[in-house]
Amino acid sequence: MPGMPAHPGALYTAEQVRDLDRRAIDEFGIPGYQLMTRAGHATLDALRALWPAAKSIAVLCGPGNNGGDGYVVARVARAQGLRTEVFCLDDPRQLSGDARQAHADFVAAGGHCRLWRGEPLDVDVIVDALFGTGLTREISGEAAELLRAANVAQRPIVAVDIPSGLHADSGAVLGVAARAALTVTFIGRKLGFYLGEGPEHVG
């Protein structure tokens, strides 16, 4: 979110955002996977607008719907001719719901994700789709190491909806958080973007 305004207007808690998301699905009949697809396209569009010379990206996909957004980004990026590396934390066959569909469509289009084993992220832009607004616990283990690797890679990071590891309501860092150059957020701006350590991480 480059150039965040001093007076951002309406801000939302994570629960309010989830409620609005449910309303879009239940009351307006928008399929959840359609919302996920829109999010993935919007993220890639914003990335390419800011870094039009980028030829390669790494997409870091987590175990939930944020990871599903990442698989959409990866599928569309491959279709547009970008060299696309996809790293996941867990076996994607354990995904469920819309995220499972996003991964299936990515694989059907010829994509492949692999578990991160400490290799450097040698690409033009990194896409952070590890954890979304539902995260409330501290990040540890391999997920923390992957985020640290992204932060020290000296590559711009594009966060999908929220930088992984940032508490959506308080702006607290939950162990470690992505330091994004750009956050492409959906439905509404989160309180945590403007509180605590949020401004240092959202871009």
Q: What is the predicted role of each segment?
A:
Residues 12-15, 30-42, 68, 97, ...:
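Conserved active-site and cofactor/substrate-binding residues in soluble primary-metabolism enzymes
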Residues 1-56:
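Positively charged, low-complexity intrinsically disordered leader regions
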Residues 2-19, 123-203:
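YjeF_N-associated NAD(P)HX repair module
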